[in-house]
A protein has these predicted regions:
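Conserved, mostly hydrophobic/aromatic
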Residues: 20, 38, 125
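Active-site beta-loop-alpha junctions enriched in small/polar residues
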Residues: 22-24, 49-53, 117-119, 136
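Glycine-rich anion/phosphate-binding loops
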Residues: 24-40, 93-96
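Glycine-rich, proline-tolerant flexible connector loops at the mouths of alpha/beta enzymes
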Residues: 44-92, 121
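Catalytic beta/alpha-barrel core
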Residues: 87-93, 110-118, 131-136
Length: 136
């Protein structure tokens, strides 16, 4: 048996459900909405990706092109191009924001997991008390 957060994982226990939020938020309030919906849906944990855009993106001018839905009824999309660095900056948070998000997850009974890719991320997740860490 393994205990993650307030849940026991093992034989005879209910399936442990982790919601993968990754870097899909656009800041603290958006991330809190993801946590809230994961809890409302009956999740046991939520996992985010924690990174430093300056460490992750070498070429700050590298463009990324993607489609956004502009009309739900017709399915019409529009192409957007922007620096990949800017996208990652929007999806990064400060240490205090990560602490607040972890506390919010705890208050809703969700274990808080994180994927990290560098030593700074490791120190952060250890300091905020992540229940599980994935190294990418």
């Amino acid at each position: 048996m393994i205990k993650l957060g307030n849940k026991i994982i093992g034989e005879g226990q209910p399936t442990f459900i982790t919601f993968e939020a990754g870097p899909t938020h656009s800041g603290l309030e958006s991330a809190k909405r993801l946590v809230k919906h994961a809890a409302l849906a009956g999740g046991d944990a939520i996992k985010f990706q924690i990174f430093d855009p300056d460490e992750l993106i070498a070429d700050k001018n590298l463009l990324f092109t993607y489609d956004i839905l502009v009309d739900k009824k017709t399915g019409k999309t529009e192409k957007i191009s922007e620096p990949l660095y800017d996208i990652f900056v929007r999806r990064s948070m400060t240490e205090s924001e990560w602490r607040e998000l972890k506390k919010y997850s705890d208050s809703l009974g969700l274990a808080f997991f994180a994927t990290i890719g560098d030593n700074l991320g490791l120190e952060l997740v250890k300091s905020i008390g992540c229940h599980s860490i994935k190294v990418a």
